[in-house]
Amino acid sequence: AVNPQVYEPDLAMAQSNLGTLYKDTRRYEDSEKLCLSAMEIRRRLAVANPQVYEPDLADTQYNLGCLYYNIQRYEESEEMYLSALEVYQRLTAVNPQVYEPYLVRACNNLSFLFLAQGNFEEAERYAREGAKYDSTHHTIYTNLAASLLLQGRYAEAEEIYLRYKEELKEDFLSDFEDFYQRGIIPPEREDDVERIKKLLSK
């Protein structure tokens, strides 16, 4: 490039946008190449000017986390989500109004990533972290309730299921179907899950 300083931010944005489009249309290999290229550029730009480019870097890392989750490369997904979360925590400390929703979104996805792998303690940890920052983002409570239930903490889980029953009933029930398909519900918790399903269906 004749003048990379001028054009690299636009190039990274174009790559990131196209990478997201490819992810949404399941062209995962193409998506990964573009997002990795965008991340490399944005990482370089963020070193020189963090205030301007760190949010873009975190956004690309978050999108890569989603991509890797979709293709079940969970370790890489975790790495990207954690990198994005670290940036969002820093940004939220300075400007909570703008960045809290992004931080909560990253916590939510990390929580579900750990749920999907049967790591219920870590799922609880990130659900609580997200809820601490923004109690209005209620979908994070689907992960918190499930992580408690599948650890055998029925009473704590039941309280959340009842509190958000009207608002999140369909999400709760579809999560259970997903967990059954993944085979992550411990046999000793199956009766508890059925009890909650009946409770939600009343």
Regions found by a protein language model. Give the residues of each.
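Terminal, low-structured helical/coil segments at or just beyond the last alpha-helical repeat
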Residues: 167-202
